[in-house]
Swiss-Prot record:
Protein name: Tumor necrosis factor receptor superfamily member 16
Region Disordered, annotated ranges: 270-328
Transmembrane segment boundaries: 240-261
Alphabetical GO biological process terms: apoptotic process; cell differentiation; circadian regulation of gene expression; nervous system development; Rho protein signal transduction
Membrane side Cytoplasmic: residue ranges: 262-416
Glycan attachment residues as annotated in the record: N52
Tissue expression profile of the protein: Detected in embryonic dorsal root ganglion and retina.
Pfam families for this protein: Death, TNFR_16_TM, TNFR_c6
Compartments where found: Cell membrane; Perikaryon; Cell projection, Growth cone; Cell projection, Dendritic spine
């Protein structure tokens, strides 16, 4: 028995046993009898096994991939999505890129190419969308739905249902929606059930006569005799809000235009008053005639010649005689205007304030070529435009020199 065991060992074959071969998944062996190693997912074979063991290397992201465990397969190149194909999943080490047809196209299973999605015509709506390898599936719009556009994305839409305060002017069809409009000028209210009545009956009421009146009521309340609960029927007054806003805007614009027109008209009248007055009028060579309140005309040049040579032009402060400023000769009025305008400070503005003018009207004079002339032209048209008033105003603004110039040559009395 002891000699039988060595004999049995000699009869066993050399190399790997049958049990070890059954455990070799690749079913490939090296020359030395070793089971060949397989490359995992994301790896490719660089050198297959033979004398040596299998050599693997990782695949390059977005360039190559390997989606199998193999002892012979190298990394495979990634698929490129071109033309009408777009990439839905990128290429990684263990998976290839996934391409699909672009929006509006589907992939034909027979040819593998992308074809344009079918369109549901008017009156037909989408049942199943167009995507991947499936074309658009359309259905005819059933009753109560419609489709008024031809496309491959919209299903049949439900028809519009008119409200209680609306009336249908066009019925809904498979190709067009229903059309409704408000009940006008009548509306219908329903009375609640009263004792002894079978069912409420609609009561049609005429609207109140609102000619010449603007109403802001949004609800119309009707009460029923024998019932303390009012029945409220919504009207169409909510739609009047844009109308009210438009009216308010028109009123504001009109008010602004009216104010602008009044200011423009005031400035225009002042300008016309200044232009109507003669500017360059000089006395005639024969002498200038002055008219006093007594109606006697005196030659001012002759009176000047008759004055004694030693009489001084300076004297007591001049006093007004109650005559109007408009009675002054044009040359004297022009002299006053020049004195008011030649001052370094705006003397004419101070004078205007003393004569009772407000700032807005004074600003109108500044737009004229000669503000002082426009001021005096406007003031001289008033009944209170006397020399006395002008003298008082000039003294208040410390311009007695202009007051003296008014009477230097303008007043003269004739001997009686």
């Amino acid at each position: 028995m002891a000699g039988f065991v060595p004999l049995l060992l000699l009869l066993l074959p050399a190399g790997p046993t049958w049990g070890s071969k059954e455990k070799c998944l690749t079913k490939m062996y090296t020359t030395s009898g070793e089971c060949c190693k397989a490359c995992n997912l994301g790896e490719g074979v660089v050198q297959p096994c033979g004398v040596n063991q299998t050599v693997c290397e990782p695949c390059l992201d977005s360039v190559t991939y390997s989606d199998t465990v193999s002892a012979t397969e190298p990394c495979k190149p990634c698929t490129q999505c071109v033309g009408l194909h777009s990439m839905s999943a990128p290429c990684v080490e263990s998976d290839d890129a996934v391409c699909r047809c672009a929006y509006g196209y589907f992939q034909d299973e027979l040819s593998g190419s992308c074809k344009e999605c079918s369109i549901c015509e008017v009156g037909f709506g989408l049942m199943f969308p167009c995507r991947d390898s499936q074309d658009t599936v359309c259905e005819e719009c059933p009753e109560g739905t419609f489709s008024d556009e031809a496309n491959f994305v919209d299903p049949c839409l439900p028809c519009t249902i008119c409200e209680e305060n609306e009336v249908m002017v066009k019925e809904c069809t498979a190709t067009s929606d229903a059309e409704c409009r408000d009940l006008h000028p009548r509306w219908t209210t329903h009375t609640p059930s009263l004792a002894g009545s079978d069912s409420p009956e609609p009561i049609t009421r005429d609207p109140f006569n609102t000619e010449g009146m603007a109403t802001t009521l949004a609800d119309i309340v009707t009460t029923v005799m024998g019932s303390s609960q009012p029945v409220v029927s919504r009207g169409t007054a909510d739609n009047l809000i844009p109308v009210y806003c438009s009216i308010l805007a028109a009123v504001v614009v009109g008010l602004v235009a009216y104010i602008a027109f009044k200011r423009w008209n005031s400035c225009k009248q002042n300008k016309q008053g200044a232009n109507n007055r003669p500017v360059n009028q000089t006395p005639s060579p024969e002498g200038e005639k002055l008219h006093s309140d007594s109606g006697i005309s005196v030659d001012s040049q002759s009176l000047h010649d008759q004055q004694p040579p030693n009489q001084s032009t300076q004297g007591p402060a001049p006093k007004g005689d109650g005559s109007l400023y408009a009675s002054l000769p044009p040359s004297k009025q022009e002299e006053v205007e020049k004195l008011l305008s030649s001052s370094a400070e705006e003397t004419w503005r101070q004078l205007a304030g003393e004569l009772g003018y407000k700032e807005d009207l004074i600003d109108c004079f500044t737009r004229e070529e000669s503000p002082a002339r426009a001021l005096l032209a406007d003031w001289s048209a008033k009944e209170t435009a006397t020399l006395d008033a002008l003298l008082v105003a000039l003294r208040k603004i410390q311009r007695g020199d202009i007051a003296e110039s008014l009477y230097s040559e303008s007043t003269a009395t004739s001997p009686v």
